[in-house]
Curated annotation (Swiss-Prot):
Protein name (record): [Pyruvate dehydrogenase (acetyl-transferring)] kinase isozyme 4, mitochondrial
Binding site for ATP: 254-261, 293, 312-313, 329-334
Changes seen on gene knockout: No visible phenotype at birth. Mice have lower blood glucose and pyruvate levels after overnight fasting than normal, while the levels of ketone bodies are increased. After 48 hours of starving, their rate of glucose oxidation is increased, and glycolysis decreased, compared to wild type mice. Likewise, their rate of fatty acid oxidation is lower than normal in response to starvation. In contrast, there are no differences in blood glucose levels between fed mutant and wild type mice.
Recorded name of the encoding gene: Pdk4
InterPro entries, sorted: AK/P_DHK_N_sf, BCDHK/PDK_N, BCKD/PDK, HATPase_C_sf, His_kinase_dom
Amino acid sequence: MKAARFVMRSASSLSSASLVPREVELFSRYSPSPLSMKQLLDFGSENACERTSFAFLRQELPVRLANILKEIDILPDRLVNTPSVQLVKSWYIQSLMDLVEFHEKSPEDQKALSEFVDTLVKVRNRHHNVVPTMAQGILEYKDTCTVDPVTNQNLQYFLDRFYMNRISTRMLMNQHILIFSDSKTGNPSHIGSIDPNCDVVAVVQDAFECAKMLCDQYYLTSPELNLTQVNGKFPGQPIHIVYVPSHLHHMLFELFKNAMRATVEHQENRPSLTPVEATVVLGKEDLTIKISDRGGGVPLRITDRLFSYTYSTAPTPVMDNSRNAPLAGFGYGLPISRLYAKYFQGDLNLYSMSGYGTDAIIYLKALSSESVEKLPVFNKSAFKHYQMSSEADDWCIPSREPKNLAKEKLAV
């Protein structure tokens, strides 16, 4: 309780500061500027200019933070006032304030450039637990009131945008930190977190091994992997694209984990497990990865729920005060993975056959020039989305007790 009161006081003091509303309002008037993978590579090339990156980020990061802060403010009051959402909001406001300070500093000032890197590290660390903390806020809100279908739809809309915003700001900060920090901790073959020659099959195999190790620990068994690769663009050559390996690994690990769990539980009485199939295909425009299992599939009515932030098959976790807050059980694995795919104009879809198995397909852009950030912007269209009211369905809804036509008398 003391921690909660401290959070509320901290957030309240930040919100009441005269500078904060003005700065949030100011930067929210600008639309975010999406970058392509090619532009991100150019920022980190051998001729990369730290001053140019500094000048761009000191404007762009506050714009992205302010845009999503405006959306937080139009959420239901009971949700915004939960301790967890107040904490997240205070983090975003404080980070925006930290970054705005660099507007008065010259890109030619080497000390300012060094301090900017330190500030980005501080902001990144501050936002470390944003995902589970916001998830906890949703749970706190749902504990206080009944969530109607329209509100639930708005929450899904907001969380997709909120977490996509977080992915994008984290990407920009990581790029600058990894490229311009004095301590070079990144992979020497990468440009920041981007691999210009990402070996897709190697990432698939690594993600599978990580999921397999987890499956073995929990179930004491796991299915094998059957991997097929087809390079339709350059037949016979390995499949490489420009991509962020950590993003791809995140998606694949989630899909393999789900496929293994379904396979083991569905085939627990069989002498051997059916392998999980992975198919990697590079075309002229798209890279497609299909993960197929024989885990029994799911009914059609459940398929859409799998991408809902309010649906999970795992027990609801309990938050504590540690930095390592749990994420499993919030139901965020698939929806967050889909956001990673969509971030650079890709997608992630599920196709299930109940009683047989599931195909999960990741679509990514094959060309770095077409891999452009997909960013939320707070404008009139976004505002109107939150104002939608519940309307009567324009399709007939079957009654639980259909009329018995045999008893109906024909009108003469």
